């Protein structure tokens, strides 16, 4: 089984055994409106157990995911005026589906929640099985999953919302460009029956919530108890945030003291 493969002297493989006391300490959100955050800061010796708001470490998983070839990077993905710290996680293009999942300490299933993350296409766009897709999933209790990112069919050059697997695709105005970091923010409104999801692409950090976005209203997730990184293409992902307010998933600032800097983007 492939695993998260740290570079530069970090762990050689994903550690799946965690000490309960350490997990509980890491799983408690620092603020009431912050549900979870993952900046991919190394946490030796439990590398895959960093961040906050989770009930355990990252592990291989996802529909038809037979590998998890994600590599921790020393540097972060960055976005203007968005606070960042730690490193990031990347993957090359693969001939099979890759996936890693992580359980939330606080499941999502009522009210409004915001999810944000940074994503950057790498290598040759569309390389990898199923046109080199990549993104983040919200995994529901009814057998449904929301996919946020670059799809494997349809509008393969844009960021979308869709059912994991490609059904119900909703296009955004954001295009996928190799080497360019993009901030994706999803407003998830959980309600009886179908939920309502709105995707904002590259909103300004520290600004008010946008009035428009790509809207998906044909999916009922039930209760979301885990998130996933799901891909076959070359990309990097960073700064996953989940909170009950828009402001908390877009904290303003620059690099934190623990950050060694940003991945350089082409001009």
Identify the function of each model-found stretch.
Residues 84-156:
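Secretory/extracellular carbohydrate-interaction modules
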Residues 12-25:
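Bacterial N-terminal signal peptides
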Residues 32-64, 251-254, 267:
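Extracellular carbohydrate-recognition regions
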Residues 160-183:
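Short, aromatic/His-centered strand-loop micro-motif at the edge of beta-sheets
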Residues 210-241:
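Flexible glycan-contacting loops in extracellular carbohydrate-active proteins
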Residues 40, 117, 177-214, 240:
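Carbohydrate-binding surfaces in secreted/extracellular proteins
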Residues 46-88:
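Extracellular glycan-recognition surfaces and repeat-rich motifs
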Residues 38-39, 232-251:
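Extracellular, beta-strand-rich glycan-interacting domains
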